[in-house]
């Protein structure tokens, strides 16, 4: 994370189930006069349904658009396509990768922080998931991938809100929040949203996300924002659910977070899609950590649980360290760095969020707490 990112091109990974509205959003990116030059990478040009009227020039896999953006296809090697874009004259304001045919966004995201050459020139900016508000309950019953896409996302666009009632939308919002407690959520119809609100946000970079929102990991920040085409009244204030009911002000750090499935079963009837969710979030909060215990622990747990960990992110306070340590990971890949000095009066505590499947909360919590500096070694 300590690498300079000033000259790097931000990369947005766009995911979402068939019919969620990705094509509509991509056509907007490739046609609107937004003054930016984006490169859009799709799996198959014909499949994604880009409007042919937008094309002014085509050169093998690269398609020039009327507004200066380009669209290119990837057949196999994503890295080769990205490197080809980097060699083109001029500079792109951003790269958007659409995951058609690649239901799992994780391998695409990993490309941008595993390959040294690509990483030197680009930076993963955000993973954006589009959700079909009308059909999400059915999608969750049919597809594990639909749930993974939400769980892995930094930003979720709940689209087609004009096709559901306010009550149905409230349930969809609860489901999305239960799957991914830290994602920023926007409600839209016809994928209508100011592109500046979802592109070049630095959402995947935990350091920048924390700079933009110091309470990013607190799970209670209000972030339901309507797109310009969303006409719903969202004054329901999370529908009466207290998403901060996890009571993170305990000082014994031994509280049971098993209710991080958010207890929504009590809020909706037996048909609620919440019952179909298999992804859970595990939130840990402790005191100052001993680095000699913490680093071997995080390495061990990610090696053991890696396939089940979709995302992990956190802020760690190390005893005797005057700077906050920010850590994030995907599956078995974890990276971290110091972010900034602790402020006067700021509570020096450690917070860590795991999002994944079949995670043993009690085991993770117990071993995490054993990394605290004041805990005696047995």
Each language-model region and where it sits:
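Flexible, charged surface loops at secondary-structure boundaries
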Residues: 33, 90, 150-151, 319, ...
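Phosphate/Mg2+-binding loops and adjacent switch elements
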Residues: 88-197, 202, 206, 210-213
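Nucleotide-state-sensitive switch-loop elements of NTP-binding domains
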Residues: 2-140
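C-terminal accessory "lid"/substrate-recognition subdomains
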Residues: 2-3, 164-343, 347, 357-378
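Flexible loop/N-cap segments at domain edges
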Residues: 354
């Amino acid at each position: 994370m300590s690498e300079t990112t000033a000259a790097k091109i931000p990369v947005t990974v766009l995911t979402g189930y068939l019919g969620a509205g990705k094509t509509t959003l991509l056509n907007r990116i490739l046609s609107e006069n937004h003054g930016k030059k984006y490169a859009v990478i799709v799996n198959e040009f014909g499949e994604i349904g880009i409007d042919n009227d937008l094309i002014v020039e085509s050169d093998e896999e690269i398609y020039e658009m009327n507004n200066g953006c380009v669209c290119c296809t990837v057949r196999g090697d994503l890295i080769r396509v990205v490197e080809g874009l980097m060699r083109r004259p001029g500079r792109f304001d951003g790269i958007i990768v659409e995951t058609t045919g690649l239901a799992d966004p994780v391998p695409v995201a990993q490309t941008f922080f595993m390959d040294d050459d690509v990483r030197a020139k680009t930076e993963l900016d955000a993973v954006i998931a589009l959700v079909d508000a009308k059909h999400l309950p059915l999608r969750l019953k049919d597809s594990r991938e639909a749930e993974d896409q939400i769980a892995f996302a930094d930003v979720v666009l709940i689209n087609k809100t004009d096709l559901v009632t306010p009550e149905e939308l409230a349930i969809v919002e609860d489901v999305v929040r239960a799957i991914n407690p830290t994602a920023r959520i926007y409600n839209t119809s016809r994928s209508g949203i100011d592109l500046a609100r979802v592109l070049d946000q630095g959402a995947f970079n935990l350091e920048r996300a924390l700079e933009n929102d110091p309470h990013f990991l607190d799970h209670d920040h209000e972030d339901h924002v309507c797109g310009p085409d969303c006409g719903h009244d969202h004054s329901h204030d999370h529908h009466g659910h207290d998403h901060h009911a996890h009571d993170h002000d305990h000082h014994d750090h031994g509280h049971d977070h098993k209710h991080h499935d958010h207890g929504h079963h009590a809020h909706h009837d037996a048909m609620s899609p919440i019952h179909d969710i298999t992804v859970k979030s595990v939130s840990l909060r402790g005191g100052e950590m001993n680095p000699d215990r913490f680093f071997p622990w995080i390495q061990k747990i990610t090696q053991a649980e890696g396939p089940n960990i979709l995302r992990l992110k956190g802020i760690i306070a190390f005893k005797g360290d005057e700077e906050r340590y920010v850590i994030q990971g995907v599956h078995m890949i974890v990276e971290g760095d110091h972010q900034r000095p602790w402020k006067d009066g700021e509570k020096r505590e450690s917070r860590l969020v795991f999002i994944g499947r079949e995670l043993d909360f009690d085991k993770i919590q117990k071993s995490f707490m054993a990394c605290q500096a004041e805990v005696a070694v047995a």
